[in-house]
Amino acid sequence: MTAIQHFFKTFFLTELLKGLALTGRYTFKRKFTVQFPEEKTPISPRFRGLHALRRYENGEERCIACKLCEAVCPALAITIESETRADNTRRTTRYDIDLTKCIFCGFCEESCPVDSIVETQILEYHGEKRGDLYFTKEMLLAVGDRYEKDIAAAKAADAPYR
């Protein structure tokens, strides 16, 4: 760019006028606003929300304590302790997720070989205190039990893409 071109761009404020033209173009377009608590937008089938632990049909928890989800978690939000049962299978004694650390990346769900840990489509949850967002095994199993039909339907719909 020559010095003369630079002078004219600076003197006539062409960059500023381009920005104002862009702003003016969107000023008169129809606005899209959602009044959130009353109105809701559709959620993607692959939305990653609140975690849940699933059970088999016979009521036994699916988690085999392989600890892959704990190893793959980039935020170190998952803590697992396990013990070996009499039939030489492992089961978790402690499975905790700290949602204040979790970045909802979905790696835990992808790494699970038995589809035990899943991320549901629940997005409306809160905590009054920091400790309210620390989910224990019992809390995660309760979420899984309550929303098992929705979780199974979402897994079935996503099966061709896995």
Swiss-Prot record:
Keywords tagged on the record: 4Fe-4S, Cell inner membrane, Cell membrane, Iron, Iron-sulfur, Membrane, Metal-binding, NAD, Quinone, Repeat, Translocase, Ubiquinone
Lineage, top ranks: Bacteria, Pseudomonadati, Pseudomonadota, Betaproteobacteria, Burkholderiales
Binding note for cofactor: Binds 2 [4Fe-4S] clusters per subunit.
Major localization class: membrane
Protein topology in the membrane: Peripheral membrane protein
HAMAP family tied to this protein: NDH1_NuoI
Pfam families reported in the protein's UniProt record: Fer4_7
Cofactors required: [4Fe-4S] cluster
GO BP, one annotated term: aerobic respiration
Family: Belongs to the complex I 23 kDa subunit family.
Name of the protein in its database record: NADH-quinone oxidoreductase subunit I
Residues engaged in binding [4Fe-4S] cluster 2: C73, C102, C105, C108
Catalytic reaction list: a quinone + NADH + 5 H(+)(in) = a quinol + NAD(+) + 4 H(+)(out)
Assigned EC number: 7.1.1.-
Protein's UniProt keywords contain Iron: yes
Annotated binding of [4Fe-4S] cluster 1, by residue: C63, C66, C69, C112
NCBIfam families reported for this sequence: NuoI (TIGR01971), PRK05888.1-4 (NF004538), PRK05888.1-5 (NF004539)
Cellular component per GO, a single term: plasma membrane
Record text on subunit structure and interactions: NDH-1 is composed of 14 different subunits. Subunits NuoA, H, J, K, L, M, N constitute the membrane sector of the complex.
Subcellular location: Cell inner membrane
The protein's role, per its UniProt record: NDH-1 shuttles electrons from NADH, via FMN and iron-sulfur (Fe-S) centers, to quinones in the respiratory chain. The immediate electron acceptor for the enzyme in this species is believed to be ubiquinone. Couples the redox reaction to proton translocation (for every two electrons transferred, four hydrogen ions are translocated across the cytoplasmic membrane), and thus conserves the redox energy in a proton gradient.
